[in-house]
From Swiss-Prot:
Cofactor descriptive note: Mn(2+) ions. Can also use Mg(2+) ions with a lower efficiency.
The encoding gene: REV1
Gene Ontology molecular function terms on file: damaged DNA binding; DNA-directed DNA polymerase activity; metal ion binding
UniProt source species: Arabidopsis thaliana
Keyword annotations: DNA damage, DNA repair, DNA synthesis, DNA-binding, Magnesium, Manganese, Metal-binding, Nucleotidyltransferase, Nucleus, Transferase
A GO CC annotation given for this chain: nucleus
Residue ranges, compositional bias (Polar residues): 198-209, 242-254, 279-293, 794-803
Chain residues that bind Mn(2+) 1: D379, D476, E477
Subunit note: Monomer.
Official protein name in the record: DNA repair protein REV1
Amino acid sequence: MKRSLGSNSSNNSGSGSNKKSKKNNNPSNQKTLGAAWGAASSRSSFRSSPFSDFGSYMEVKNRKLQNQFETEASAASRGVSGSEKLIFQGVSIFVDGFTIPSHQELKGYMMKYGGRFENYFSRRSVTHIICSNLPDSKVKNLRTFSRGLPVVKPTWIVDSISANRLLGWVPYQLDQLNDTQPKLSAFFAPRSHLTPQMASPVTSFQPDTGYSEAEEGSSIRADDSEEARDHIDDEIDGVYIENTTPELTEQTGTGDLKSSEMNAEGLGNYDIEEKEVSSELQSTTNLHSTSDNKSVHANGKNGGKSIATAAGSSTRRHSTLEDPNFVENYFKNSRLHFIGTWRNRYRKRFHGSSNGLKWADSGQNTAEMAKKSTIIHIDLDCFFVSVVIKNRLELHDKPVAVCHSDNPKGTAEISSANYPARAYGVKAGMFVRHAKDLCPQLVIVPYNFEAYEEVADQFYDILHRHCRKVQALSCDEAFLDVSDLSDVETEVLASTIRNEILETTGCSASAGIGGTMLMARLATRVAKPAGQLYISAEKVEEFLDQLPVGTLPGVGSVLKEKLVKQNIQTCGQLRLISKDSLQKDFGVKTGEMLWSYSRGLDLRSVTAVQESKSIGAEVNWGVRFRDQQDVFILVQHFLQCLCKEVSLRLQGCEMIGRTFTLKIKKRKKDAEEPTKYMGCGDCDNLSRSITVPAATDDIEVLQRISKKLFGSFCLDVKEVRGVGLQVSKLDSADPSNKGSRTLKSWLSSAPAVVQIEQDDNVFAAKVRENSDCNRPVTGGVSRLRESNSEESSIQSGDTNSSLPPMCYLDMEVLENLPPELLSELDGTYGGKLFELIEKKRGKRRINCNSPHVSLDGTAASIKELKSLSVKIHGLSTSGEKEYKEPYVPHPSIARTSNQHTIEMTDLLPSSLSQVDVSVLQELPEELRADVLGAFPSHRRQQSSSDVPKETCKKQDEEPIDLKGTENEIGLSFSSLWFGNPPLWTEKFKVSGNCTMEKLSAIYFKVAQSRPMLSLVLQHAISEMSSFPDAASASDLDKAIYDVCELLKQYINLKVGGDIEEIYLCFRLLKRLAARSQLFLQVYEILSPFIQASISEHYGGSLSIP
């Protein structure tokens, strides 16, 4: 009977009769969640099975799996002690999706420690759902998905095993409010998506930049004041810490906190700190990093493994991946950036308040001055905390710290802590989670940069009222040289200043007084908080005897360890070592420093704020790029924003620079993820520099240089973790002569610009009246300017006042000058030079195309001459981006000109292959565009002599937009790809060249709907078995030129957004070059051009195998 039910005939006969009844009975047969998949099946295979329906099959399967699990669990638990067997008793988990630990590992844990593992979800048997990430559909319907069960991360299992007890699942629940699933639109977003509107709003808690002070350049002083403070004061408030700069840390730390690129690569299964990310990222547009490699390595490598919860918002929105304003926000919310910008404001505000800030007497010995000097060191106590809580009396006696996040399990870093917090061991640079462990009642407050700025200004107003010699170290710390204030007691003055600061700002300050800057600062350390200490010269040795060597400026952890190995722990012990021994063991400079500081000697004097030796900016937090496609959009946008920031800093300091250094942090091979969220981690530091002839702060120059340097690294952008740009070899930028030192300004300068007079006859007559060379021209062109004030406007300068008389000029030299230079000289002489030349020639008439003017000075010739002068100088004088090229005669016309005619085309190369690309790249953009624009005109004139003169003039007069077409070449062929079909197809069709006609026909055949040149070239290879050469050399030259123009314009159209198309075209062109002499020459001519275009746009070269 069973065989007959399973036969084919039985299947066919019974399948149709029971279809409707089975559909009606489906819902009543469902017994598990998975039963719905197959309960409605009408296939006869289920009718022939021992199960009544799919639901019964699943019920039996689940029972079998549970039996297998219990058997394996019994065997696995034999080696486990009794106390460990029942950790997960009563817990039944269902694993959804990819997790770490894996599905099988979690199953093993349940077997070993008394839990149950469900292969199929059932609300009746499952107690916890384990997952790391959820798709968008489940996030939106979380209640439906979980059926009210807790959804927790797998770290709950791991941590419970580590603790040998069942931990509460609440801290580990997956509270994923937004999906992390990439959107399809993100992969096809145009360049226009990089708009400021995409930036997230900044709310109350602001991030800290924490970029390296050494890299800051313009913001942070280059001397050792920060380093000294770092090692002198163990209770420092985090303002100048080099090794623990705030907010992001750790280039060597590891952990399992996932960074954004891991999610982007589909590895987002690590246990990212959800509440930390939600707290730190939702409250700000971005976070910031330090650039030091050692700041939190001591915090442990696995500190983040027990942290659970997932990001409340997409982490990529707070990195370079999707935040177009990332760089701007990075520095906007930076504490160190605030200090740097404040220093610039201070320099401008108090400039000249202390006699130009130059106090040292150059005729007096520095050592002699140090002996009789008295220095006060003033430092506000816990500045960044005190300013925030000064109006919050309830927090004055409580432990408080400044940070961007108060998440107790976060990796945000403490920037500054008050003294009650420091009593618990809380220090600057410490993770919030570690600080909360030491001090659970720690109160976290956000930054208030406006209040900081106000208090800092009040602080320095008070200092400058009481002392003339003030050296600002930061917004809250300064040295005062009161050696010349003999009418007031030093200690009384310090006390008066401190009391006035407290009354005005509401913040306490500490003061140290000593004979040197070193002793004053050491005294402040002892006086803190809210006190003052005076160390007289007689008490210096006594004070230093028991002072640990680690508190001396410049003694870091490495140097301190070396000293301890030699049993040198105090300054008293250090004084027993001779200078020669110290210099032998630690080097000349370090040995000199140790010997001097151990005796309280310090030859430094209080001076003004020193000019920065370098200015730059570095970003090494949140830098993540997906793949090579980001090079063309996100990387370039990032570099543009970074160059904008550096340019603004240069302009703020009124400096320009010549050497540009691009620094890259590249993730080390096999480096683990950093403990700090979105940190740079363990990196290799790479850098390359370039020096330009003329100093500049122009943002376009910086962008071009940075793109070129970045391309020279040849990096996988996925490995980039930090980028910095530094400008050195600085020079002062005089605002009144800004731009006068640039090559562009020198080339475009015109001492005289002649305005076209409506009545040219009157102008010509007046020029003839003033062209007499019998009387010397004294006093420059002043009289010329007076006589021609109505007809011409002449820009005078120092050069004009020393011009030689025209009668002293060598006419033979003048006649052989280039037309542009000759026109410029003519303008300098008020338009009289051309007439003088003609008079010397005996009043000979010359062709109107010549750059000279006839003696009788007809209106037409003068008008053309003046038009030429305006065209030559129009770019520099009008300030417009569009200009007209001067008319250059056609070669055929030039041959008929007078022998004195000077053609500009004589100065141009015969082909672009003769141009040095490296030199071309170093030219300013306007000059480079001018050179590239002139070259095709020259080629066109040589190869198309049959073009009418009127056509040439019309084409030459068409303006070129330098801004819109940065690499635009050709003056009259810019429309070959205009229209549908493009104009070149008609031109090629009637060219008379077989190859060109065939290309036109192929376009209409295959590419009319998709105007892609690669389609035309691809079909040309397959359809054209042979390529007949032109009948004559001139025809071949003309065809080569026309095809070159077609490809050049196509490159200009595509190079900015479709480099793949250009690559494909030149691969195909190289194949065509093997078959045709025409395409071979085209390929050789265009190869340097394409490489120059690629280098200009992307900073590299295009490899064409």
